[in-house]
A protein has these predicted regions:
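Short catalytic micro-motifs in class I SAM-dependent methyltransferases
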Residues: 13-17
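Residue-level recognition of oxygen-bearing side chains
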Residues: 20-23, 102
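Conserved catalytic/acceptor-binding region of the Class I
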Residues: 37-102, 106-123
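C-terminal lobe and adjacent flexible extensions of AdoMet/dcAdoMet transferase-like proteins
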Residues: 101-185
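A short glycine-rich, Lys/Arg-flanked "PGG" loop and its adjoining helix->strand segment in the class I
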Residues: 22-37
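Structured loop/turn residues at beta-strand edges in well-structured enzyme cores
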Residues: 4, 81, 147
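A short acidic, Gly/Pro-enriched loop at the edge of an enzyme's catalytic core
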Residues: 1-9
């Protein structure tokens, strides 16, 4: 898309699969018009925390689940991309399942696996899965297993051309080259 060509960007529960959130937000800022609105939701790090912990207790050093950015990381990335007036919120939802396999089947059905490029490869094996299920079963309450989902919602506005943005520890201003006055003799 061309620079400054879009009025609104809306993304619902997709950005957690993006391997480089700051780069995605910088691209959003590039294509949004002045005063364009960015609205999105994404999962946070407490999503599937029970399942992650069960994998860790089963001896899995790297649970086969994608990591999710925390609300502070999301906000920092929005500011670094140059968005103004960011507003973020987080909500925790707990869904319950009759067993761990029902949760795993649902995750597989929605394509929610490990999206990391550098994820460990190979099969986990039935014994690892059995250990994870045993660890998860310890959380059973009223004949159901809990599954926490942290949802981060965010909105921000695109500033006008020439508004500084953060890159590292410096503010960087940019403006169209045709606005540079020319002196003629």
């Amino acid at each position: 898309f061309a620079d400054n060509s879009i009025d609104l960007i809306f993304s619902n529960l997709c950005l957690q699969w993006v391997p480089d959130l700051p780069a995605a937000l910088a691209e959003f800022r590039r294509v949004l018009r002045e005063d364009g609105l960015l609205l999105f939701s994404s999962f946070g790090p407490d999503t599937l925390i029970e399942l992650r912990e069960a994998y860790l207790q089963a001896g899995e050093r790297h649970p086969p689940l994608s990591p999710c950015a925390a609300i502070r990381q999301v906000g920092d990335a929005m500011i670094a991309a140059g968005f103004r007036n960011p507003v973020l919120d987080r909500d925790l939802f707990t869904l319950t399942y009759p067993d761990a396999m029902s949760l795993l089947r649902e995750l597989r059905a929605i394509g929610a696996g490990d999206a990391r490029v550098q994820r460990p490869r190979g099969l986990g094996g039935k014994s690892r899965q059995a250990r994870m299920i045993a660890a998860y079963e310890a959380l059973r309450h009223e004949d159901r297993l809990p599954s926490t989902w942290e949802v981060i919602t965010a909105m921000a506005w695109a500033p006008g051309p020439g508004t500084p943005r953060r890159e590292g520890n410096a503010d960087v201003a940019s403006f169209p080259a045709d606005r540079i006055p020319r002196r003629t003799r």
